[in-house]
Structures are given as C-alpha cells and as structure tokens.
Amino acid sequence: MLNIIGIGPSKGNITLDALKALDDSDIIIGYKKYIDSISDIIEGKEVIKKGMGDEVARGELAISKSLEGNNVAIISSGDPGVYGMANLIFQLIGKYDDVDVRIYPGVSALNYSADLLGAPLHDFATISLSNLLTPLSEIKTKIEYAAKGNFIIAVYNPISKSRKEPFRLFKKILLDIRGPETLVGIVDSSSYPSKTTIVNLSELNEEDINMFSCLIVGNKLTYLSEGYMVTPRGYAIKNDIHPASKNFYEKFFNGDTPTGPNYECEYYPCHVYGQYCDFCYCPFYPCGDGSTGGKWIKGKDIWSCEDCTWIHSKD
C-alpha cells in the first residue's frame, strides 16, 4: 500500500486518520524538512529523507518500495492534492500495475492562512506563481481572470531568490484591475509559529514575502475589522432603526429637517465634514457589516458612514 499523507502546515494540524496511517506504515519517505517536523511520531520506522527538487525520484522510490510489499507513506506538507505529491504519484503509477494508493487529506496552506487572517474566503481562486512547471503567460492569464472575476485569490509560491518576475507581474495586474487599496493578507510559515501581516496592495513589497509565504488577496468587498480580514457572504445583518434615524424622520415629516451638520445631535460629530449627517436618513442605514466602508463607533454606539463607498460621497 502506498499512502500519500498530508501533514498540514505543522504537526498540530495532522488529522487522526493521517496519524494512524503513519503508525501503520513501514517506510516513511519525504522531503527532509517535512520528515524532521514529525520525527517524534515516526520513531522506529525506516525513514528516507530527500532534498528539495527531487520529487520524481521520491515518487518512484515510494512506488518501488510499495510494490515490494511494504506499507509506504510518502509525506506532503499541507494537502497532497494542492500543489502536493498526489498529482505526481498518480502520473507515475500509470507505468505500473497493481499499485494500491490511498490519499490522506491535510490542512492546506490556504485554509490555514485564511483562518489565521480572519474570515477572508468567499468564492476564491488558488494560483501558484512558480513558473518552473507552468509558463508565465499561463500564470498571467489566470491572474487576470481571477482579478476580473472579483475572486478572493490565494497565492502559493509568491517569490524566491531567483524567481521575482511572476510576483512583479502579479502585483501590476492586481493594481490595474483591483486598485491599490485592495487588502492582502501575508502568512509567513518559514518559522513556527507563522507570522501574519495585513497590508494594502500598494504596500506589498518583495522583501516582505518568501517562498514559504501564502498570500490571501481580498475582493472588492473585503474589509478590515479589529485586525482581521473579513469578506461578507451576503448574510443579512438586521439592525433596528437607530433613534437618530427616527428622530430625523419625525422632524422631516414636520417640515423641520435640519440642513447641514446637525449640531443638536448628541452624537455629533461622528463622521467626516461634508456629509451633513445624511446617514440619519440613508435608507440602508445602518448597513451593519462594514463592507461598504462604514464603521461602528463603539464609544457612541452608533454607525458612522465615514468613508462609505456605496451610497455617500464626500462631494
């Protein structure tokens, strides 16, 4: 039996099924860094460590050992089916007869990263910027369509010491289509625990990322709340009509509507000058989830339409 086992981004994310498969395996094969990360749970096993870049030889060896009657585990970080060993193994076994294979899913880097960043995922696309196996022209096309489709974009292999052009192209396309204020979450897993940063696209620099980084690019509705990225999925967040709105309508129907800033309002000033307190009669107020640029003022217990990009303008 050949077991393709995803160990997730760290030992603490291994599934119970994967742990049992490791325990049942006679031989463990994998990239040295991944093997070392689970060394304490594979003690007593025959372990074969390989270097980066010899994935084909690693796969052939695992198949050969399994055909000899061994129960073999080949290790993949994250999930084996997401830029992992599963694809390669299934290409290789076409040359052989009677190779029994089972895949054990793992927590993918994109899911792990998204959870650290908050709740940024909605409809999303996953793109690797590595052009070792994929032409740059194809990567460019995928980036353009994902950006135009307003997908959240999870980016694997964003950059390396010798491979910078795909990242530069990626950033240029996103700036042109999405704009400089687009939120980007960076999860750097080069060390443990992983480090997270959230920046605007215009602030995303080459020196801030590496080959172990996973990027989560927000869409047009993604916003920042309490340091977390959030992409609303369309849930209706119901809010009672605020007393300030009721007060406005009472004055409106009595012909006593204030013009300009309402200096008598106990909440004034709660937003930028020039909006003339129009949040009080906005038919969508309070919009409730922050996706339009508004924000909740905790100390005043009121919703501010400052920076709202949906209905209001600063003109």
Regions found by a protein language model. Name each.
Residues M1-I5, N70-S76, F124, G149-V155, ...:
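Generic beta-sheet signal
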Residues M1-V101:
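Class I S-adenosyl-L-methionine
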Residues I5-G6, I74-S77, I127-S130, V155-Y156, ...:
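Short beta-strand segments
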Residues I7-N13, T134-L136, T197-V199:
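Short gly/ser/thr-rich secondary-structure transition/capping motifs
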Residues S10, V82-G149:
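Class I SAM-dependent methyltransferase SAM-binding "motif I" and its flanking Rossmann-like core
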Residues K148-P243:
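A contiguous loop/helix-start segment that scaffolds small-molecule binding in enzyme catalytic cores
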Residues P243-D315:
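Cysteine-centered metal-binding/redox modules
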